[in-house]
A protein has these predicted regions:
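Mature-chain termini and adjacent capping regions
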Residues: 1-276
Length: 276
C-alpha cells in the first residue's frame, strides 16, 4: 500500500517512507510522485525531503511542467513551502535533459527558476531536433514562457544534409520555428563557405536568410552582397543588392547572383529592369 501525503495545494505518494523528527528529514522510497498545480515530479528511486530547508533531493528524477520535461541524474529542488510542494528553484547535476516541442536538450548540469520560467544549461550543451539537426554550445537557456532556446558561445549546428553552421550566439524560437544565428556566422558545405553577421534559419522553408554584408567563398572566386538566401535542398545561394563577384583579379558587379554549391561557381543573373 502506498504512502500518500496531501498539502494545502500539493500531493505526494511513494511505496514507503522513513521520518527523522530530530533532523526534520522525510525519505520517500521507490516510485515517488509529487504534484503541485501543473508541475509533477517522479523518480523510481528514493527522494529525501529536508523539511527545515524546504529542500528535496532525488536521483534519476523527472520534473514535468505543462508540456515541458526536465530530467537529471540528481535533482535538488527548493519548495516555496512544504505545504504546497511548489518548486521555487531546482538544480540538476550529471546527465540533464529537457524535452519540449520536438526538441531535446542535453547538458551536464542545469538550473531552473520558477519565477522567470528559465532553465539554464551548462557544460556540453546539445540540442537535437526531430528534423535532423544538432546544435551545441557552451551555455543554453530555455524559456518555458517564451518557448525559446538561447545558445551562447561557440554555437555549432550540424545538419543531416551536410552543412555545418557556427556563430557566437543563437536563438531557436519554437513557436515560429526559426533559428537566429548572431555574430561571426559561418556556414560550410563542402568547399563552399558563407559568412555574415546574422543569419536566420526558417525550418518550414528549410532555408537560411543572411543579412548585412554576405560573402560566399568558393574555389577561386568570391561573391559579396548585402543579403542572401541559402536554399538547402537546392544547394544554391542567391545573393542580392550590390553584388560583386571576384575571380582571378577580375571583378563583375550586378543586382543578383547565384552561387551553386554543387559546382562551386557563382554567376550573375539579370533581374527585370536590373543591371550587370
Amino acid at each position: 500500500e502506498k504512502v500518500i501525503g496531501n498539502g494545502e495545494k500539493g500531493y505526494f505518494e511513494a511505496d514507503k517512507f522513513t521520518f527523522s523528527k530530530p533532523k526534520g528529514i522525510i525519505t520517500l522510497i521507490n516510485n515517488v510522485y509529487m504534484k503541485s498545480g501543473d508541475t509533477e515530479l517522479r523518480t523510481p528511486d528514493k527522494a529525501v525531503m529536508f523539511m527545515n530547508e524546504n529542500k528535496f533531493v532525488s536521483a534519476n528524477a523527472t520534473v514535468k511542467k505543462g508540456n515541458d520535461t526536465l530530467k537529471g541524474d540528481t535533482i535538488t529542488a527548493f519548495f516555496k513551502d512544504t505545504k504546497r510542494f511548489e518548486i521555487d528553484r531546482a538544480f540538476s547535476n550529471g546527465h540533464t535533459e529537457i524535452r519540449s516541442e520536438g526538441k531535446k536538450a542535453f547538458a551536464d548540469r542545469g538550473e531552473y527558476e520558477a519565477k522567470t520560467g528559465l532553465v539554464k544549461l551548462f557544460d556540453n550543451v546539445k540540442i537535437i531536433d526531430a528534423s535532423g539537426y544538432t546544435a551545441t554550445a557552451d551555455i543554453g537557456i530555455y524559456s518555458s514562457t517564451k518557448k525559446t532556446f538561447t545558445l551562447q558561445n561557440n554555437v555549432k549546428v550540424k545538419d543531416k544534409s551536410g552543412y555545418t553552421a557556427v556563430a557566437k550566439n543563437g536563438i531557436y524560437d519554437l513557436n515560429n520555428k526559426t533559428f537566429t544565428l548572431l555574430n561571426n556566422v559561418r556556414i560550410d558545405k563542402g568547399s563552399n563557405v558563407i559568412t555574415a553577421p546574422k543569419a536566420i534559419y526558417f525550418q518550414q522553408k528549410d532555408e537560411f536568410r543572411f543579412y548585412d554584408d554576405v560573402k560566399v567563398t568558393q574555389d577561386g572566386n568570391t561573391a559579396t552582397a548585402l543579403s542572401g538566401v541559402y536554399f538547402i535542398k537546392k544547394n544554391i545561394a542567391e545573393l542580392e543588392h550590390n553584388v560583386v563577384i571576384t575571380k582571378d583579379g577580375n571583378v563583375v558587379r550586378g543586382d543578383k547572383a547565384i552561387s551553386d554549391f554543387n559546382t562551386s561557381k557563382s554567376r550573375l543573373v539579370a533581374k527585370k529592369g536590373g543591371r550587370i
